[in-house]
Amino acid sequence: MRTLCSLLLICCLLFSYTTPAVGSLKSIGYEAELDHCHTNGGYCVRAICPPSARRPGSCFPEKNPCCKYMK
C-alpha cells in the first residue's frame, strides 16, 4: 500500500510540473507576435500608442499594443 501511494505521489508530481512547458510555449508565441509586429514596421509599447501612430495589432501575452507610425 505504501508503494502504491508513493507511486501515485510521484505521478501526480510529474504531471503537475507542466508550468515550465506552458511558460516556454508562451514565450515562443510572444516572440512570434513580437517578430510579426517588428516585421510590419511596428513597435510594442506598454501604454497607448501616441497620436502620430496607429494600432495594427497587439503583442502577445500581455496584450501590449503594437504601434506603427502613419505615413
Curated annotation (Swiss-Prot):
Q: Which Pfam families does the entry mention? A: Defensin_beta
Q: Describe how expression is induced or repressed.
A: In tracheal epithelium, by lipopolysaccharide or inflammation.
Location(s) in or outside the cell: Secreted
Q: Name one GO biological process term.
A: defense response to bacterium
A GO cellular component annotated for this chain's UniProt record is: extracellular region
Summarize tissue expression. Answer: Kidney, uterus and to a lesser extent in heart.
- Keywords in alphabetical order: Antibiotic, Antimicrobial, Defensin, Disulfide bond, Secreted, Signal
Origin superkingdom: Eukaryota
The record's section on InterPro entries has:
Defensin_beta-like
Q: Which cysteines are joined by disulfide bonds?
A: C37-C66, C44-C59, C49-C67
Tagged with keyword Iron: no
Q: Which residues form the signal peptide?
A: 1-20
What does the record give as the function of this protein?
Answer: Has bactericidal activity.
Q: Which family does it belong to?
A: Belongs to the beta-defensin family.
How is this protein named in the record? Answer: Beta-defensin 2
Native organism: Mus musculus
Gene from which the chain derives: Defb2
